[in-house]
């Protein structure tokens, strides 16, 4: 059978722009996988191309067969003893089973036997006719539509009195072509497959666009319909035009980089045309973050930055039309953006009439959580925690700076600008703090206390920012855990996982001399009797986040488990411990010592009572135990010294010298001796060994 390429296009009204790419990939992907599962692809070389524009979802699939190949099927029926009587004739049960398969009694002669003895069974062989392409596409199309990731569907009628159709947007056309042939009878959403689609609403050369063949689809839409059907091609064209427009302006200007905005604009236009617009320079007195946000979020414009990263008074618009005279389009966009910028300027001017300090009282009217009080109460807790952290770091001056920053950190929440643009919280606080004449370190801390906001985000710039950011995140974590408001599954409305990672990153990357569990407990007094003490559960939660983060960095699960099993309190030490464990794992002595360490741990766990790491040299009897004791006396102090100095790699490598005496001990010494004094002394020797071996990590976790 000759294979041809297949095209399936669903023509619809404008799709949700933020979901377009996902919808396009899902639609095409399910079609491809369904056809593959039905055996309708001629080879493993078949390729899929997904198309997605504001008004269409389509898939082009190569090497599609007109009919799947027939299949020989062998089906087990029943044991021979059940299907045939003593004379070898078919039983009623066998006749009934064959009838269910559409076969008569004459099929008995063609049955085969497989197996031996009681396991011998009868098998019926038949040929299953391969599915026809039209039927296969119908099934695949139904599945693709059913599985589209649509958060909300519309209900509509194709004509008055017709039954309702449910889909993300009303559909108006269906094209299904196998080569040049329409697959007759394929239907979807009340539509029947044909060859006609539609191009650009205003600039198509012909309407409808009649697709000649599956392979002509993209080219015909571009030439006759003025549509770039491929999402990727359209995106690349927009990026190219944005860069070209900026270069024509000169002066080193460049469009702001925003991948999400580029994706959204790609989903809004079918044939992009980038135009240069501008606004009055007086608006540049407003913080550029405000102007950039309103242009991007509200208007989908691309602001232009100069070589120094400062906002210019020009911006780029991606239009869906390409008139000979674009002045009307440019003027319209400039008129639309002007009121937005004027609002931002008004908010900025009004907000600066009040100091941040005068807004603190207003936070008492903003509810934070019904069990944890208002933002005003929360601010007082963060202040208390920040001062406690600064004291633990031994810096009185830092405590004063952090206290002021913590007091004012949330005050921009009650400003007009942040009320309009919540994304600017912290950013506007910094601008208003500088306007009030506050120290730059305090202003930076106000902005930075939200950092890191996401994975890979930068950390606070100064020490005050780090202290307030830590205090803010710890207040959230301890408070939420204390009222039992824990993340479950995908639900994490208070971003506790992100806050935990933020705490980890600051403790590690800023190399803070703070013990984790001491730090968590120090937060509790700020809450009084509002919450339960859930710091043990919170510590587990943080260690779990740390473990996941370390595995993502490339450390093995065994390496991570070995270090975190000891629950090291200085998280800034964890990386060094892991590097030491990795270096130790490369030593030839490592496997034997890890296995021995595991054995020692098991022996000590099974001891009748708690074993102290004490050895009486006079009680030692066997040569092997004396040798191990002597080796420990020689090696352990040096390893302990290196550990105390933070040289974990050297400490573990020093301990590698214990391999031979440890092996000899287990080969020649009976730990559970009949003499109680001898047994206790040997257990004490093993406890001493265990203590020496497990300062950096629990090496037993490295055992195979």
From Swiss-Prot:
Assembly: Tetramer of two alpha and two beta subunits.
Family the UniProt entry places it in: Belongs to the class-II aminoacyl-tRNA synthetase family.
Protein name (Swiss-Prot/TrEMBL): Glycine--tRNA ligase beta subunit
Family annotation (PROSITE patterns): AA_TRNA_LIGASE_II_GLYAB (PS50861)
Record organism: Delftia acidovorans (strain DSM 14801 / SPH-1)
Catalytic reaction annotation: tRNA(Gly) + glycine + ATP = glycyl-tRNA(Gly) + AMP + diphosphate
Pfam families for the chain: DALR_1, tRNA_synt_2f
NCBIfam families attached to this UniProt entry: glyS
């Amino acid at each position: 059978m000759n294979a041809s390429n297949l095209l399936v296009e669903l023509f619809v009204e404008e799709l949700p722009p933020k979901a377009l790419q996902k919808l396009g990939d899902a639609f095409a992907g399910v079609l491809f996988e369904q056809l593959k599962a039905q055996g309708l692809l001629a080879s493993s070389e078949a390729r899929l191309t997904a198309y997605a524009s504001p008004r269409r979802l389509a898939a082009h699939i190569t090497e599609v067969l007109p009919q799947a190949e027939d299949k020989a099927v062998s089906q087990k029926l029943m044991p021979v003893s059940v299907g045939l009587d003593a004379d070898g004739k078919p039983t009623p049960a066998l006749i009934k089973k064959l009838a269910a398969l559409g076969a008569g009694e004459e099929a008995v002669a063609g049955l085969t036997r497989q197996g031996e003895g009681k396991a011998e069974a009868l098998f019926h062989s038949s040929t299953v006719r391969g599915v026809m392409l039209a039927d296969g596409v119908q099934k695949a199309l139904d599945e693709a539509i059913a599985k589209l990731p649509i958060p909300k569907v519309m209900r509509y009628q194709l004509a008055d009195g017709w039954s309702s159709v449910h889909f993300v947007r009303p559909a108006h056309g269906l094209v299904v072509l196998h080569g040049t042939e329409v697959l007759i009878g394929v239907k979807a959403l009340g539509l029947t497959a044909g060859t006609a689609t539609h191009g650009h609403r205003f600039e198509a050369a012909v309407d409808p666009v009649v697709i000649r063949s599956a392979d002509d689809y993209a080219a015909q839409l571009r030439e006759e319909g003025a549509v770039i059907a491929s999402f990727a091609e359209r995106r690349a064209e927009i990026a190219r035009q944005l860069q070209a427009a900026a270069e024509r302006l000169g002066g080193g200007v460049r469009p702001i980089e925003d991948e999400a905005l580029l994706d959204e604009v790609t989903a809004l236009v079918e044939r992009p045309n980038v135009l240069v617009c501008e606004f009055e320079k007086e608006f540049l007195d407003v913080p550029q973050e405000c102007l950039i946000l309103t242009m991007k979020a509200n208007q989908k414009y691309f602001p232009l930055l100069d070589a120094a990263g400062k906002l210019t008074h020009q911006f780029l618009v991606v239009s869906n039309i390409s008139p000979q005279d674009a002045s009307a389009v440019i003027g319209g966009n400039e008129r639309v953006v002007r009121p937005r910028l004027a609002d931002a300027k008004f908010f900025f001017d009004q907000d600066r009439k009040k100091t941040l300090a005068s807004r603190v009282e207003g936070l008492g009217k903003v509810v934070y959580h019904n069990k944890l009080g208002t933002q005003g109460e929360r601010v007082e807790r963060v202040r208390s925690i920040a001062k406690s952290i600064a004291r633990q770091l031994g810096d009185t001056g830092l405590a004063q700076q952090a206290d002021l920053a913590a007091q004012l950190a949330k005050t921009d929440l009650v400003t007009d600008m942040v009320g309009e643009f919540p994304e600017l919280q912290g950013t506007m606080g910094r601008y208003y703090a500088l306007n009030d004449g506050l120290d730059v370190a305090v202003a930076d801390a106000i902005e930075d206390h939200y950092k890191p906001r996401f994975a890979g985000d930068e950390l606070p710039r100064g020490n005050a920012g780090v202290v307030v950011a830590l205090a803010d995140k710890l207040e959230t974590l301890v408070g939420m855990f204390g009222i039992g408001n824990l993340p479950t599954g995908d639900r994490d409305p208070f971003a506790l996982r992100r806050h935990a990672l933020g705490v980890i990153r600051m403790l590690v990357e800023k190399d803070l001399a703070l013990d984790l569990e001491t730090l968590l407990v120090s937060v509790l007094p700020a809450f009084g009797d509002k919450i339960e003490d859930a710091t043990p559960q919170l510590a587990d939660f943080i260690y779990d986040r740390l473990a996941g983060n370390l595995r993502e960095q490339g450390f093995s699960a065994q390496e991570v488990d070995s270090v975190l099993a000891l629950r090291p309190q200085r998280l800034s030490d964890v990386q060094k411990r892991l590097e030491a464990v990795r270096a130790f794992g490369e030593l030839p002595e490592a496997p034997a010592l890890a296995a021995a360490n595991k054995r020692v741990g098991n022996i000590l766990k099974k001891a009748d009572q708690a074993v102290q790491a004490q050895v009486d040299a006079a009680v030692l009897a066997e040569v092997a135990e004396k040798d191990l004791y002597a080796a420990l006396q020689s090696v352990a102090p040096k390893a302990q010294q290196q550990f105390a100095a933070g040289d974990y790699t050297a400490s573990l490598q020093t301990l590698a010298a214990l391999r031979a005496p440890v092996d000899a001990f287990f080969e020649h010494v009976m730990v559970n001796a009949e003499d109680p004094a001898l047994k206790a002394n040997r257990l004490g020797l093993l406890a001493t060994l265990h203590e020496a071996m497990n300062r950096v990590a629990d090496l037993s976790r490295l055992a195979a």
